[in-house]
């Protein structure tokens, strides 16, 4: 294959000069021949005169002008199939768990076209999560795309871990976890939790049910920009074999941020708030591939960091358009000590439709939202004049809304370590029974503190007896 020479290095971006007749294509992978460790560059632009501009998939420390670079003639390819299960890989598909080579029979390019319109399928089957507020207000669809939106420290990763615990462990299919620019500690904890749960089997990797791909916070932007595509490529292989796959991505915002870091170095003019001008396109390329086909389904859960709690920031705003369900975490709810801090008035789902969830579920969910919305409107009056100035009907609304707020809390399995309360999985019909009774006034005589951190309504009645 053609060889070239490095002519310029600007941080994570490198210019390489090739003979005019052998210029590599965009997205081709190039190997740095003289590097001690395997170092791959990915072509991003052809600058003319035989010079291309590429992103480094790794650290550019030790690179110098004049080094020889070889074109592989193909995009970055990663191992796919059952050999990836139970293993931790990096953006290039190399094992980083110190357990030897992956040894997969097949490799796929990380740049693939999205399935055509004819191949795609839409499903309305619901995916029960066991989390009351999600199952009631923003139900998930099997094969749907779900976003967990929240600022720093409101609980995105904990909620995602609980969903992995409740869905992946109950679900007999396979999962792929892509850690994009998140904390290495969390990735390490996740791996050990999966081992304890039996989802990762170190002795017999073929019995494992999850493949893990990491490009964490400390890695160069090239790795963080492409690691989501690596994880997605592995999930696509399982889907095309006719399986139902769960794809967890933590965190989509870091994918955008890596694009921003690289974009300026590539010489593109920044757009709104300093983001790359290709923000919508980059997001679309990733999201359009996360879809279900007639062969199999990919259900994806994506954590989305919201900078400065501003949902109108271009990055979260661009992500919104692609999702079927949005779970919005609210700092004010977290500040009141109500966890999970999911905002029932801000979270949405396309599945919350009487034709999909049924009339009863729809009515209960809308009733809960109406009660909470009315309470929100009355809060100003209460703050100025106090509760005594409210009508009897409004006092009743406030009392029920406060009980609903508390009943939306729930102890999590993954938080058991630091709360001491055993986690609870609440079936959908129990969730509906509880909230239907609350709206009808069946539990008006139970004090509100009995509803804190309980599972079903029966637990709340038991708590009331102890008060």
Swiss-Prot record:
InterPro entries attached to this UniProt entry: AAA+_ATPase, ATP-synt_VA_C, ATP_synth_F1_bsu, ATPase_a/bsu_AS, ATPase_alpha/beta_chains, ATPase_F1/V1/A1_a/bsu_N, ATPase_F1/V1/A1_a/bsu_N_sf, ATPase_F1/V1/A1_a/bsu_nucl-bd
Protein keywords: ATP synthesis, ATP-binding, Cell inner membrane, Cell membrane, CF(1), Hydrogen ion transport, Ion transport, Membrane, Nucleotide-binding, Translocase, Transport
Gene3D superfamilies: 2.40.10.170, Bovine Mitochondrial F1-atpase, Atp Synthase Beta Chain, Chain D, domain 3 (1.10.1140.10), P-loop containing nucleotide triphosphate hydrolases (3.40.50.300)
CDD domains: ATP-synt_F1_beta_C (cd18110), ATP-synt_F1_beta_N (cd18115), F1-ATPase_beta_CD (cd01133)
Record's bilayer topology term: Peripheral membrane protein
Entry GO MF terms: ATP binding; ATP hydrolysis activity; proton-transporting ATP synthase activity, rotational mechanism
Enzyme Commission no: 7.1.2.2
GO cellular component: plasma membrane; proton-transporting ATP synthase complex
Coiled-coil residue windows: none
SMART domains linked to this entry: AAA
Reaction catalysis annotation: ATP + H2O + 4 H(+)(in) = ADP + phosphate + 5 H(+)(out)
Cited Pfam families: ATP-synt_ab (PF00006), ATP-synt_ab_N (PF02874), ATP-synt_VA_C (PF22919)
Subcellular location: Cell inner membrane
Binding site for ATP: 150-157
Homology family: Belongs to the ATPase alpha/beta chains family.
HAMAP family cross-referenced by the UniProt entry: ATP_synth_beta_bact
Assembly mode: F-type ATPases have 2 components, CF(1) - the catalytic core - and CF(0) - the membrane proton channel. CF(1) has five subunits: alpha(3), beta(3), gamma(1), delta(1), epsilon(1). CF(0) has three main subunits: a(1), b(2) and c(9-12). The alpha and beta chains form an alternating ring which encloses part of the gamma chain. CF(1) is attached to CF(0) by a central stalk formed by the gamma and epsilon chains, while a peripheral stalk is formed by the delta and b chains.
Known role: Produces ATP from ADP in the presence of a proton gradient across the membrane. The catalytic sites are hosted primarily by the beta subunits.
Name of the protein described by the UniProt record: ATP synthase subunit beta
